[in-house]
């Protein structure tokens, strides 16, 4: 039977998947044929010959004309719907039809209509989201003038114009820009998660055209380049123009998903559009997501089919035996039909007749009821005011209505870093200068007090201060004003030692272009404290120091590298002193200090430990005054190393080390890589709920690790954090095995051969068993090492090692690698996964996970459009999972348990009745009762239970994350629970048949007339059944609302109203062939034994459920039962107000600004390519 699930999973695919797969197949076929892309600028006619796709994106499933056939085709993929369609055809065969055709048609039409309307509403929302992106405007060059067109209409070969802060419309070749040398600054946070500005440069032949529309319009260059691919950092091709050929690489290409920054305008030639862009190539395949409960229901429906077939077979055999033993006595007045020649023939026909009679074993309203429940729970998410983000006026949004209960079963969360855990904001928080810390708030008595707005330093005395900058320690301002020499050197170092460039976008307004966000924060801080970096040239740096312009001659920039983890500048002061200023990682600078700084360095290191314990990013600042003669000797060595062709970088590093020694320590800085509000608390809470969190980011390793410590994914109390940094397969394998051996020495070094064989067959029902480590560990792996670890032979090693860790950080990842990691856990762990991110680079993992969550940000909506749920802040995730997810799962499980039970109890009465009617496929109930049972009589109470049930207050759900655990292990509804429902239904059907049978057998009314007729018996059974079902739903409800009362007791009352109507003289006399229970209700319900039967049957049916609910928590309790008992005890006291406890960060890890810096930017500065005119003239304008 374990293979049936896999079989049913294969069956449950839908047409949207099929259509999208066919479209992707056509795209793949076209790309295989396209070995080289060829296009001409400004020549749509030529480019149209290649049938390149347009620039639109599509996430919707249906169109206006194909909605009805596609939606019906999709709905009939569900086994139950297909079953009832087949059943309808069977009912049209008179030889076997035992029920009227409308008993199936009416419910089937209602079910299909409700689901169709819901699907249509969902798809309209997707259409609107697509239009929001596709209908954005962009400027395009047409016949020598700039025109506005929609994004969807952009074609390959068009020349488009982008301005500052505009998103890039399509992958395009940069032609020219407003910046010198055709440079353009871009932000790629949506692609790789990095907030650093990056520089792209146009080739010289096109950058000379600048914004000359005549030249750009006449440009007819031909580009030959790679066909569409998903490699973000790879692009090669040639540009043929005016008889010359120019080489192209990825430095010339602007990718869709980037945002233009600090560049007034730029022009680009569109190379890839729509689905061909590298962003969309990395977005992964769209799949129709179904929950684990959906797959389980398909398996259970197959079980029901098998059980139904078995019963029909037994009943048909019983019919054959009965016909041979007793049936011939009845043939005198009820002869066989002409098409029945023997008892075997009759048995064969009876098989199908019972197949129709017992059809309610497969509940026709199951799927539509599930959809209604999911829709209702989705609205709870949309309406949740506690997930509403007021600054952006954005509520949480359930973008799909099919995954709500899956939110209550998540075991792995895969999170992006930039923009998801962090706010993309770096803030100068604290510093240490000459052994004294600044940045804490103190009262008049010198006692530490929390920061408050009233303690904010007033920088109004400095007209060049950045109004957005905040600082809360006035003593630092006083130290600056008192002209303390070391404080002066500290801020002078920060204002000179950087690669920031300044720009005056509006006259008198200074704007910084920071290649590293850390540097931007530092330079902004020095600006507010009176040391204003104003401008630079290749030879000078101009600083306004406390209102005075000072020009420093730039002698050398000792550039950053990953190995050096520091940078230095050498300048000549106006007083003709040669000074070296250096800043970098504390562990590096510490080794370069002069021995006289020993005591100061120890104090500063203590301060750095304090800063790091708060999760701040730290670095050290130092200087050295150089002897002029020594410097002249050194600069010659530097020049020789610079001109070397072989091992230039190595030789430059040695020259740098020669002069970066005997440094004098100035102090240290602490920058807050600002986490979103509540991130550490959320992660701690989710960890208590046994949810593992992996960070998948494109950012650098040190930055990612630092954030992992800040948000409590990694903790100091861990037994170790393993770094997998291998650059070849063997090294990566060895590092993974070494880590696993340390975590669990008895763990097999060699993977189980059987598991390895099954691992290569993902379609097999295979699950990797959990291995528990002997301690708490973390794992860090880079994208380069991940490329080897994700190979077929190593991926299982990676999975085993990573899943033994409490936290995992994967850095320097491509979007495709993110999806591969998520898929790896999905395939082998068989758990529910959730991916959360905010950028276009997160789309692939959002699509790959069972549940995709998009963080809505100001820059882009790509991740949100591809997500299943969206909101604005990461800390809303705990509410989404622990409140909405848990409740949705609990409600769905209660619904399914009751739904299957009530259908079994209802249907199996026919089984017992067969033994008393000669196995003739006659029904116990009135035909209208069969039609209305699932649609009217029992639908509203169970919907009320499924939409309003709440076992505990939402505050308790957040206070006790352990309540989430049953959903992770699928304890509340599984195959075992289904069997219990079946047994419960069998028992109840037995009671519901034989107790009324005993009541009416040989019974008389008060007037002496017999009441043991079929119609009276039928009415008694169905009335008893409705009474029992009402009490069952009441017993299962723990949270009563007015709606629950109305639905539960109102449905009972509605049954009696309809019963009286159907038995009324008006209907029965006018339509006797349809309504044939004339006066039965009036006569039967007036008898006391009928009501005594109802009470007795209800008590007998309720006893097992009451006993089980009482004994199970006592004899077989789970952790959630113990927590619930604790909560029920605490309910005697007021419900606690949930307070987010401030998490302290005891981590002693420190990371420097250099980790988010890009090597080689110093050389770009000294080349002068990034610089504009007259630095001194510009500086004077700020005085």
UniProtKB/Swiss-Prot annotation:
ATP binds at residues 416-418, 519, 560, 583, 617, 697-699, 812, 818, 841-842. The keyword Translocase applies. Highly expressed in testis. GO terms for cellular component: acrosomal membrane; acrosomal vesicle; membrane. It catalyses: ATP + H2O + phospholipidSide 1 = ADP + phosphate + phospholipidSide 2. It is found in: Cytoplasmic vesicle, Secretory vesicle, Acrosome membrane. Its cofactor is Mg(2+). The chain crosses the membrane at residues 96-116, 299-319, 348-368, 904-924, 927-947, 981-1001, 1014-1034, 1049-1069, 1090-1110. Pfam families: Cation_ATPase, PhoLip_ATPase_C, PhoLip_ATPase_N. GO terms for biological process: Golgi organization; phospholipid transport. Mg(2+) binds at residues 416, 418, 838, 842. The active site is at 416 (4-aspartylphosphate intermediate). It comes from the Eukaryota. This is Phospholipid-transporting ATPase FetA. It comes from Mus musculus (Mouse). The gene is Atp8b5.
């Amino acid at each position: 039977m374990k293979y049936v699930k896999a079989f049913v999973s294969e069956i449950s695919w839908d047409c949207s998947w099929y259509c999208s797969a066919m479209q992707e197949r056509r795209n793949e076929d076209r790309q295989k044929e396209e070995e080289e892309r060829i296009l001409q600028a400004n020549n749509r006619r030529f480019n149209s010959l290649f049938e390149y796709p347009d620039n639109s994106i599509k996430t919707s499933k249906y169109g206006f004309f194909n909605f009805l056939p596609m939606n019906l085709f999709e709905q009939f993929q569900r086994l139950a719907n297909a079953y009832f369609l087949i059943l309808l055809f069977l009912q049209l065969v008179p030889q076997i039809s035992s029920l009227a055709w409308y008993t199936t048609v009416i419910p089937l039409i209602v079910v299909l209509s409700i689901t169709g309307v819901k699907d249509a509403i969902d798809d309209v929302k997707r259409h609107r989201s697509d239009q929001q992106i596709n209908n954005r405007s962009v400027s395009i060059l047409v016949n020598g003038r700039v025109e506005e067109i929609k994004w969807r209409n952009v074609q390959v070969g068009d020349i488009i114009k982008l301005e500052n802060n505009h998103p890039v419309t399509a992958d395009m070749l940069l032609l020219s820009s407003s910046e010198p040398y055709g440079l353009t600054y871009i932000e790629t946070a949506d692609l790789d998660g990095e907030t650093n500005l990056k520089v792209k440069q146009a080739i010289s032949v096109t950058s000379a055209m600048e914004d000359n529309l005549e030249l750009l319009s006449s440009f007819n260059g031909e580009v030959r380049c790679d066909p569409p691919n998903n490699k973000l950092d790879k692009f090669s091709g040639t540009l043929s123009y005016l008889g010359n050929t120019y080489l192209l690489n990825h430095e010339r290409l602007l990718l869709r998903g980037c945002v233009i920054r600090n560049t007034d305008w730029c022009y680009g030639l569109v190379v890839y559009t729509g689905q061909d862009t590298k962003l969309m190539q990395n977005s992964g395949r769209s799949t129709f997501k179904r929950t684990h409960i959906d797959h389980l229901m398909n398996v259970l429906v197959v079980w029901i089919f098998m059980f139904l077939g078995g019963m029909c077979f037994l009943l048909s055999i019983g019919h054959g035996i009965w016909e041979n033993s007793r049936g011939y006595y009845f043939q005198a007045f009820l002869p066989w039909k002409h098409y029945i020649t023997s008892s075997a023939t009759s048995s064969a026909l009876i098989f199908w007749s019972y197949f129709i009679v017992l059809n309610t074993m497969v509940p026709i309203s199951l799927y539509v009821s599930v959809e209604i429940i999911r829709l209702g729970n989705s609205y709870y998410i949309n309406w949740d005011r506690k997930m509403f983000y007021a600054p952006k006026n954005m509520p949480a949004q359930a973008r799909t209505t099919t995954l709500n209960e899956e939110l209550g079963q998540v075991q792995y969360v895969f999170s992006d870093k930039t923009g998801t855990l962090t706010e993309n904001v770096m803030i100068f928080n604290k510093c240490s200068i000459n052994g004294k810390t600044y940045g804490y708030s103190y009262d008049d008595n010198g006692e530490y007090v929390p920061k408050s707005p009233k303690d904010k330093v007033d920088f109004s005395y400095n007209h060049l201060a950045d109004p957005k900058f905040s600082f809360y320690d006035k003593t630092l301002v006083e130290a600056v004003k008192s002209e303390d020499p070391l404080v002066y050197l500290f801020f002078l170092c920060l204002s000179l030692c950087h690669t920031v460039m300044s720009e005056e976008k509006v006259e008198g307004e200074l704007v910084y272009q920071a290649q590293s966000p850390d540097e931007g924060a530092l330079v902004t801080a020095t600006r507010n404290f009176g040391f204003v970096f104003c401008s630079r040239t290749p030879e000078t740096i101009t600083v306004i120091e406390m209102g005075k312009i000072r020009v420093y001659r730039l002698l050398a920039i000792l550039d950053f590298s990953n190995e050096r983890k520091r940078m230095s500048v050498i300048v000549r002061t106006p007083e003709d002193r040669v000074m070296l200023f250096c800043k970098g990682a504390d562990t590096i600078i510490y080794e370069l200090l002069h021995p006289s700084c020993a005591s100061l360095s120890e104090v500063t290191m203590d301060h750095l430990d304090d800063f790091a314990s708060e999760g701040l990013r730290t670095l050290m600042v130092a200087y050295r005054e150089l002897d002029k003669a020594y410097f002249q000797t050194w600069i010659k060595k530097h020049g020789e190393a610079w001109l070397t062709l072989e091992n230039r970088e190595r030789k430059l590093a040695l020259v740098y080390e020669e002069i970066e020694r005997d440094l004098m320590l100035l102090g240290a800085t602490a920058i807050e890589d600002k986490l979103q509000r509540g991130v550490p608390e959320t992660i701690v809470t989710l960890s208590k709920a046994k949810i593992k969190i992996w960070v998948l980011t494109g950012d650098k390793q040190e930055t990612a690790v630092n954030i992992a410590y800040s948000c409590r994914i990694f903790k100091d109390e861990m037994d170790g954090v393993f770094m997998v940094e291998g650059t070849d397969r063997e090294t990566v394998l060895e590092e993974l095995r070494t880590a696993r051996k340390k975590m669990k020495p008895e763990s097999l070094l060699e993977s189980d051969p059987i598991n390895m064989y099954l691992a290569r067959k993902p379609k097999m029902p295979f699950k990797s068993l959990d291995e528990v480590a002997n301690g708490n560990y973390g794992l860090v792996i880079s994208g380069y090492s991940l490329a080897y670890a994700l190979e077929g032979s190593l991926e299982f090693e990676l999975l085993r090692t990573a899943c033994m860790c409490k936290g995992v950080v994967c850095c320097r990842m491509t979007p495709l690698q993110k999806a591969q990691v998520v898929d790896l856990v999905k395939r082998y762990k068989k758990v529910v996964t959730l991916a959360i991110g905010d950028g276009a680079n997160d789309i692939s993992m959002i699509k790959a996970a069972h549940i995709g969550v998009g963080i809505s940000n100001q820059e882009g909506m790509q991740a949100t459009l591809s997500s299943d749920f969206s909101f604005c802040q990461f800390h809303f995730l705990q509410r989404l999972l622990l409140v909405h997810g848990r409740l949705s799962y609990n409600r769905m499980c209660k619904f399914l348990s009751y739904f299957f039970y009530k259908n079994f109890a209802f249907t199996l009465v026919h089984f017992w009745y067969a033994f008393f009617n000669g196995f003739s496929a006659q029904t116990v109930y009135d035909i209208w009762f069969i039609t209305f049972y699932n649609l009217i009589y029992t639908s509203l109470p169970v919907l009320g239970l499924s939409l309003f049930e709440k076992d505990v207050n939402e505050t308790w759900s957040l206070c006790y994350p352990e309540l989430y655990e049953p959903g992770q292990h699928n304890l509340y509804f599984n195959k075992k629970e289904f069997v219990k429902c079946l047994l419960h239904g069998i028992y109840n059907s037995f009671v519901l048949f034989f107790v009324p049978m005993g009541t009416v057998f040989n019974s008389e009314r008060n007037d002496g007339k017999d009441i043991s007729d079929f119609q009276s018996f039928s009415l008694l059974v169905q009335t008893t059944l409705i009474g029992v079902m009402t009490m069952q739903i009441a017993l299962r409800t723990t949270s009563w609302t007015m709606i629950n009362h109305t639905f539960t007791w109102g449905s009972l009352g509605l049954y009696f109203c309809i019963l009286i109507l159907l038995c009324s003289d008006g209907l029965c006399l006018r339509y006797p062939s349809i309504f044939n229970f004339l006066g039965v209700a009036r006569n039967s319900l007036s008898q006391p034994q009928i009501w005594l039967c109802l009470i007795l049957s209800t008590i007998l049916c309720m006893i097992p459920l009451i006993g089980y609910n009482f004994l199970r928590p006592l004899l077989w309790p789970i952790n959630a039962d113990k927590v619930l008992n604790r909560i029920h005890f605490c309910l005697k006291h007021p419900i606690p107000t949930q307070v987010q406890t401030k998490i302290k960060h005891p981590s002693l890890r420190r990371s420097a600004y250099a980790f988010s810096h890009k090597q080689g930017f110093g050389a770009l500065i000294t080349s002068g390519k990034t610089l504009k005119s007259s630095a001194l003239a510009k500086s004077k304008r700020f005085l």
